[in-house]
Amino acid sequence: MLSIARKIFGTVNDRKLKPLQARVNRINALEPIMEALSDQSLKGKTAEFRKRLADGATLDSLLEEAFAVVREAAKRVNNMRHFDVQLMGGMILHSGAIAEMRTGEGKTLVATLAAYLNALEGKGVHVITVNDYLARRDADWMGRIYGALGMSTGVIVHGVSDEQRKAGYAADITYGTNNEFGFDYLRDNMKYSLDQMAQRGHHYAIVDEVDSILIDEARTPLIISGPTDDRSELYMAVDALIPRLEDSDFELDEKQRSVVFTETGSEKMEEWLTEAGVLEGSLWEPSNISLVHHSNQALRAHKLYARDKDYIVKDDSVMLIDEFSGRMMEGRRLSEGLHQAIEAKERVDIKPENQTLASITFQNYFRLYKKLAGMTGTALTEASEFADIYKLEVVDLPTNRPVRRLDEDDVVYRTAKAKYNEIIKEVRAANAKAQPILLGTASIEKSELLSHLLTAQRIPHKVLNARHHEQEAFIVAEAGVPGAVTVATNMAGRGTDIQLGGNFDMRLENERAAKEKALGRELSEGETSLLGAQIRADIEVKKKQALDAGGLYVLGTERHESRRIDNQLRGRTGRQGDPGKSKFYISIEDDLMRIFAADRMDAVMRRLGIKEDEGITHPWMNKAMETSQKKIEERNFEIRKNVLKYDDVINDQRKAIFEQRMEFLRSDDVSDVIEEMRESVIEALVARTMPEKAYAEQWDITGLEESLKTDLALDLPVREWAAEEGVANEEIAGRIREAVEGQYAELTRLIGEPQMRRIEKQFLLQVLDMRWREHLQQIDQLRSVIHLRSYGQRDPLNEFKREAFNLFDTLLGELRATVTRSLMHIRVQQAPQQQPQQVAPPPRPQPPQPAPQPPQQIRETKLDPDTGVNEMNPADKTQPPGPALHQAEDDWTNTPRNSACPCGSGKKYKHCHGAIETQKA
């Protein structure tokens, strides 16, 4: 019935696409008009569109004409014409949705349509890719189209300078990787002046391989951190004990990827740690809780993380591997000491643990964009998650030509040995007829095992995994050559097309570079054209050979946890209507089968009389495998949702801090904020030592006097005031407030108001950053133990929200107290006239390194009194300061608000330097 209804009414997806066809027809009708325009007139369309926008037109009203302009520019500069389905893809991207497009359907070209249209607003468009190579390639390749239309293109990749980053983000359209965009956001929120910031907002983003970035990497937070104390000896001492454990000493759950000590295991660790001289007393005493943490991380390092699967060892370092793409994740480190535990296990240099300085998850970073869109070949399996988390709709686009790929049923073997033997036979048979083969594996370990087996059989092949990622693009580009055998870890997000016969652009680039190197000069335009013609002719011959052999044969050597990864592997063949074939070879010893279905599957195969070297193919097997994958996907979805619930708590706090910080950066005068902080500190101090309903005899006068000295640098006769007949705490608070404001006004006069405003701003930003980092560390610690609240029948999430709020409230209180204390302890001394002035506020806690330092270091600033140039950094030009500051115990007269202002203006203090509007929090 359902199929009949779909034929009559069409699917939901069909109904989404139907209205787009009318717009495609109108774009096609504009093609002759655009073809008649000169290059200059075509470029002039951009200025025309922008004027129409300024006059009240909308982007949607310009869409058809703008798309026609982009199509014409692509034809002229790149010899590429957008197909009708690609125009539809551009409309879907512009609407803020995800376009599902098969491999080879030209996603890179589709992005130019929506990117150009949205860049007309002048607020910047970000096109996000999965690696630096693709970002550079696409920026160069598609940048020609934008350049022909008068738009600028920027690229943000690892290693570019701050100036290059600023220029890249200032461009109309910016290409870059998800990591760099996220880290730049965090870096910008650690800068000390607006002109140092790189990004200019989050207007519109197009995410390529959107499922890889927003789903697979959603659980991975971006963290900027600084090193803490070296504990390498402790890591080594604990690591040496783990191999002595027996299986009964821990419980391992491979499905949940968790491992914990049993009671006997804990007792053994306690005994061994004591013998090693590391532990004093019981392991479970509060003072030894860090040893419990180290022991747990060492156990995880040994039992959950495998070399050449989860990480590799390269250049005396442990490099993590992306489980979905098989790539090395350079610069990424596991947190909470787990990375150090793995380094101890592998006996490599143990790098210090890091303290979090700033962090954000991809989920929350990409939700910053006012409009978000994405492209991928495999999003439908995760459509509900895109809708739930990101409010993104997935629209499945038809292919430009019918798919001719043959997807065969899985073949299941009882042993891995039998599976690999059959794979080698299949490769040999396909290779004999020059059919190109792509062998997909789930880990480096498996890819190197397969490579070893192929080498033993003298079958020439190339290996693509995290060890050889530098040659990635070239290896993938040549995988469609007749007779090519390519072994690759997960092909997710590779980004380079596998074209039958070879990739023309890649070959031309490489062969031209080789010829120029041999000749010692650049090839002329004619020589380059001749070389291109020769390569194109050779590719056509090889393409025919590959087609005659049946097209690219994708052979999966095991199923991945995610159906999307398997679908992406299949999608590498059958591009643009080419023939192709895909097939998976599986054994019940594979990780996925062993964890989820091994016993049941083995029993069935035994009952059927299947021998170890025989395979079985049946739709039931496919169904069982799909069920296992769905279970894992559902579990991972729940984990990601749970991560987001917790991260949303800290995200609200992060947004509040970052927004407040940005306000401080934009303001040249934060004296209102500083005065409000002083008021809050005084109120809190009086409330603590002189409670409202307490009798005068119950007041803590000694505590108040000491706090006034330490927090506000004031020595006031509070005891005498308290002894006065009928004096109330409000009156004493008023006298304290008057004394504080008077002293601060005098400091401002002596230092000079412009200089004081700069000092206030620098102190405020530095203390805010320092307290925020400490807060993040506390939040990390809270999150690592909050699950234990469930044992007390309390909801960990609600407990986390409550505790995090209390910590945030404490952060704000400490911020006010620290800023006020630091500023009130500044003392002024007249320096000899002939000497330069010095500004040196009291020592303050330094943020961990490498933390971004402010452009003007308040400590040890040496200013030329005539020019205002900082002699320690001549580029830092400020206004000449007032008298130099130093830490002394001088007594200074107070300036009551109704007294004459010490600056000599003749006005009352409250109407001059004290004219600050009090704001209550």
Curated annotation (Swiss-Prot):
Gene3D superfamilies: 3.10.450.50, Helical scaffold and wing domains of SecA, P-loop containing nucleotide triphosphate hydrolases, SecA, preprotein cross-linking domain. The keyword Protein transport applies. It is a peripheral membrane protein. Its cofactor is Zn(2+). InterPro entries: Helicase_ATP-bd (IPR014001), Helicase_C-like (IPR001650), P-loop_NTPase (IPR027417), SEC_C_motif (IPR004027), SecA (IPR000185), SecA_CS (IPR020937), SecA_DEAD (IPR011115), SecA_motor_DEAD (IPR014018). Keywords: ATP-binding, Cell inner membrane, Cell membrane, Cytoplasm, Membrane, Metal-binding, Nucleotide-binding, Protein transport, Translocase, Translocation, Transport, Zinc. ATP binds at Q86, G104, E105, G106, K107, T108, D497. Zn(2+) binds at C901, C903, C912, H913. Residues 829-921 are annotated as: Disordered. Its EC number is 7.4.2.8. GO terms for molecular function: ATP binding; metal ion binding; protein-exporting ATPase activity. Residues 829-838 have a biased composition (Low complexity). It catalyses: ATP + H2O + cellular proteinSide 1 = ADP + phosphate + cellular proteinSide 2. It holds the Pfam family P-loop_SecA. HAMAP family: SecA. Part of the Sec protein translocase complex. Interacts with the SecYEG preprotein conducting channel. Has a central role in coupling the hydrolysis of ATP to the transfer of proteins into and across the cell membrane, serving both as a receptor for the preprotein-SecB complex and as an ATP-driven molecular motor driving the stepwise translocation of polypeptide chains across the membrane. This is Protein translocase subunit SecA. It comes from Hyphomonas neptunium (strain ATCC 15444).
